[in-house]
């Protein structure tokens, strides 16, 4: 049987237990019926990102025609297991600093009316 390698990337919040993240990701792959047992799934810690710690779940499957469904199933499982283990998937946050204008809108309207 011929296998193809696939990947799912995910970011977790800084401060997360990286060993637990690895364990959860492997569990998610190992428990899907279409993920090959050999070669075994693996996890790479791929990045210290701007908002998250990056991980990559690598796994093999012979079922190329259903792979998007398999990846979706695994992502749902990852989300559920992360919630159970208090592992957060962050999202970028931006701070906006609005500078006030010294001229009020009322003053501008009055000047335009003249």
Task: Go through the PLM ranges and name each one.
Residues 4, 12-16, 20, 26, ...:
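Solvent-exposed, non-transmembrane regulatory segments of membrane-associated proteins
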